[in-house]
From Swiss-Prot:
Name of the molecule in the record: Uncharacterized protein YPO1740/y2567/YP_1481
Membrane topology summary: Single-pass membrane protein
This protein's UniProt keywords: Cell membrane, Membrane, Transmembrane, Transmembrane helix
Ranges that cross the membrane: 11-31
Signal peptide interval: none
Pfam families to which the protein is assigned, alphabetical: YebO
Source organism of this protein record: Yersinia pestis
InterPro entries, per database record: YebO
Amino acid sequence: MLDTNMSAFGVASIALPLLTVLFFLIVWFFLSRASVRANEQVRLLREIAEQQKRQTELLTALLENATGTRDGQNDSDTVSPLDFKGFIPER
C-alpha cells in the first residue's frame, strides 16, 4: 500500500517540473515571436520614413525646377502656410 502511494508522488514530482518547464517554454516562444514582429514593424516604419523623406526632397526639387524659385525667394505661385491658417479640410 505504501509502495503505490510513493509511486503516485514520484510521478507527480516528475510531472510538475516538466509541466512548469513546458509552460515557460511556451511563454518564451510567444514573447520572442512578439519581439521579432515588433522589430520587423520598426524596420518597416523606418524604411517608410526614409522613402517619404526622399519623396519630399524630390518634390521640393521638382517645385524649384518648375517655378525657378529657391527657399529664400517668394513667388506668386508658391503658397504660404499662413494661407491655410483657418482652413478646415472636409472629412
